[in-house]
């Protein structure tokens, strides 16, 4: 355990920094999506239509496309070969919606080509989900019960596992985005025209 300085354990500072970075990244993604959600695609296709076209063009015939509830809850599930698009993405003709749909198609292409980092990410998802779910409750309970260091340490370890998952995920996400940009530039879906 690290020593206390001025009554503060440096580990807590690292956790706070991690939370701040996570919050800032989430805010950036949301603001960028909102900005480009106001720009319509020149092709006037929805996110769902774009995804179906991309999958067909990439000759991926075993992946379904469905609409799900939520906002920016879009995901690709390699286990059931399902590309799920949130309501905001599925029905919108904005370049943001088409970009998100293409990004998720990038994950389907990764799966189709057996991209190793995607396989690694899929293998550690269960552990990371547990870590992100229990980390803050354990830290909070540890603090509430007279600074129970064992619970706090387990919470920090769980948070660390979730952070490691995010680090492993970055190359997968960047690769999916690169694939999406390549696909979109070939399909000419990104010629924007401002909405009225």
Language-model regions, residue ranges each:
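Short, strongly hydrophobic alpha-helical membrane anchors
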Residues: 1-8
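Membrane-cytosol interface motif
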Residues: 39-56, 181-189
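Active-site recognition of the HExxH zinc-binding catalytic motif
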Residues: 99-111
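Catalytic zinc-binding patch centered on the HExxH motif and its immediate surroundings
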Residues: 68-82
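Conserved small/polar residues in nucleotide/adenosyl-binding loops
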Residues: 189-196
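Short pre-active-site segment immediately N-terminal to the catalytic Zn-binding motif
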Residues: 87-98
């Amino acid at each position: 355990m690290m020593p206390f300085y001025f009554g503060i354990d440096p580990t807590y500072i690292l956790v706070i920094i991690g939370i701040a970075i996570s919050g800032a990244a989430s805010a950036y993604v949301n603001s960028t999506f909102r900005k480009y959600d106001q720009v319509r695609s020149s092709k006037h296709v929805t996110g769902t239509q774009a995804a179906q076209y991309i999958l067909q063009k990439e000759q991926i015939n075993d992946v379904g496309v469905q609409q799900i509830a939520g906002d920016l809850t879009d995901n690709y599930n390699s286990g059931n070969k399902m590309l799920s698009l949130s309501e905001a993405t599925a029905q919108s003709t904005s370049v943001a919606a088409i970009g998100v749909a293409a990004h998720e198609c990038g994950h389907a292409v990764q799966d189709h080509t057996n991209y190793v980092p995607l396989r690694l990410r899929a293998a550690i998802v269960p552990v990371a989900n547990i870590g992100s779910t229990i980390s803050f409750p354990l830290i909070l309970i540890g603090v509430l019960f007279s600074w129970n260091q064992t619970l706090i340490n387990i919470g920090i370890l769980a948070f660390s596992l979730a952070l490691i998952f995010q680090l492993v995920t970055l190359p997968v996400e960047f690769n999916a985005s690169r694939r999406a940009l390549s696909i979109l530039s070939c399909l000419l879906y990104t010629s924007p025209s401002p909405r009225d």
